Amino acid sequence: VWAGLPFPEVGADDFPVMLDALKAAYDTRKEPFAVRLLFAVRWKLGALLGWDTPQAGLGGRVASLRDRLPPDLAKTADDATPCTDPFTEAYQLGNEAARELANKTVHDIMHLGWAATGDGEYELRMAALVKPNGLFGRLYMAFIAPFRHLIIYPALTRQWERAWRDRARLLDRTDRTI
């Protein structure tokens, strides 16, 4: 679990706005060269080695978390704002959401939650629940761990901070009080 990410001017009901801003920011992101390079290499290797085929993903090698949820909870994913990132919605509530992906290396569930900090503020908390796929998945995750911790996670944190700051523009809203 990551430590919470505090954001200025947030309230108890801002989690859906945050999710929409994060998803909108994904399509307009400007990542550092190192991040772009790492993802380009990962997606190229995945294509060449068949890591990301439908058979290796959700509904193929891995049953989706959404399929194992109570129907009323699973249905909440239908109302989530679409996104072009590689994750699939599992569920979305007013203060938490889960998104997942699966491929030949892992089954990953990203949980985002909106939590009170005790001083009247709120923060975004993220947990990644990762189940490596066999020995190869464990070795792959061990190999990429330094890249995730030193390059990807700090860049992701900055991207999320920008998404909140730029939410009015990203969500094409003129009301700056969101």
Model-found features: residue ranges?
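Beta-strand/loop substructures that line and gate deep hydrophobic ligand-binding cavities in soluble
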Residues: 103-142
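Short C-terminal domain-edge/linker segments immediately following a structured domain
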Residues: 34-36, 128-132, 154-162
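Hydrophobic-ligand binding "helix-grip"
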Residues: 72-118
